[in-house]
Every structure is written in C-alpha cells, then in structure tokens.
Amino acid sequence: NEETIAVFGLVNSTVFQDFPKLKIIVSHGGGAIPYQLGRFEAPSLRRGTGKRFSDGLRQLYYDTVLYTEDALRLLIKTVGADRCLFGTECPGTGSSVDPVTGRSMDNVKPMLENIETVSAADKQKIFCDNAKAVFNLK
C-alpha cells in the first residue's frame, strides 16, 4: 500500500538530513511497515552504513487509524508512543460495523484506552501531547 512505499522511500532517503526540522505524519499506522519490519531492517544492515531502518522510522510520526488492537499494539511497540498521534476515520470507511461483533471498525479511542500494556503517560502522549509537540501548540 501507499503508506508502506512512502515510509520506505523516506527512511531510505536523505530528506531528514536535508530538512532536519521536517515533521511528517504517516497515515494508517505506516501501512505494513510495523508488521514487515524485519524484511526492511535486514537490507539496511547488509548495506553496512550503520544506519538501521528501524532508527529511521523514529524520524516520522504515525496516526493510530488501525482497526485492530494487535495492529495498534504493534505500531506502538515498533515506533514508540512518542511517535504516535491519535487519529480516526469516522465518519468514513471507519464507520463500518462488523456484523459479527457489532463493533465499529474505527473504535480506536476505547481500544487504546483498554490496552493495559500502554501506560497512562503514553496514552496521554498519543491522545494529546504528541500533537501539541508536532504542531507547536501550547
């Protein structure tokens, strides 16, 4: 998907060296990047530049528009809570309801609130503090 391609291209470019103050927020939790991290990390190590793909991921920010708790947990584990910003697609495709469970697909807020392995401080970062920092808000 397009998020995966964009993240791969940005991390493997010099854009953050050329524009060190640039802040980019990637939609949909970075696409397949967290799930396929090992496949992207291996070539970066093979190049022998000393630059790990996973370190480059932490130069970007990611929204939490992911529809499963497992995907959300993996994103936070992969890039860190300080690189995640709360996001939603409601109304829109996120308004879809799973006919089996009755759950709205884009119920990120309660889903994140109920992940016990994410601390209250990290939840505060994701819901509020990170956006304030990215957009220089008080």
Model features per residue range: what roles?
Residues 1-14, 18-19, 23-138:
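H/E-rich (His + Asp/Glu) clusters that bind or coordinate divalent metals
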